[in-house]
Amino acid sequence: SSGTTSNNAIRSESDTDNITIINNSGGHIHNNNSANTVLRSATVYISSVSTGTLTNSGTIENKAGVDNYALGIAESGVTVTLKDKGKVIGKINVAGSGHTIKLQHGAGQAYFYDIDGAGTYDLEDLDGNPVVKGSAGSIGQGANEMID
């Protein structure tokens, strides 16, 4: 990229409201951008006045590498649900406030998301796995066995 243009695959502007993006299983949203800002480099960049929703069961990838941004969320009230066998290949940046990141990869599943930025967000694992905020990760519980 030239450094002055945006090469986002999907981008909403800061005055957008009530946006919904769904990437179904098998879907692959990608770009190849290592620009120096999240706004310019993120594969998917969602900015919302008060409500935005992204549900990902497919793949969101920045082909410039995992150290570049695949997902950026900004402004206010964006809810991101990362679920099933969906993948985010690249970093996630959070700016603004009042966001929620929900994880639903299945009970006992291991995952890791590199999340940075100065924004505020709540983190939930909808399957009850323990989750760590910052860089979101869960340690797979493997085969659990109950003995009476």
Which residues fall in each region the model found?
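Long, low-complexity, polar and repeat-rich extracellular regions
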Residues: 1-148
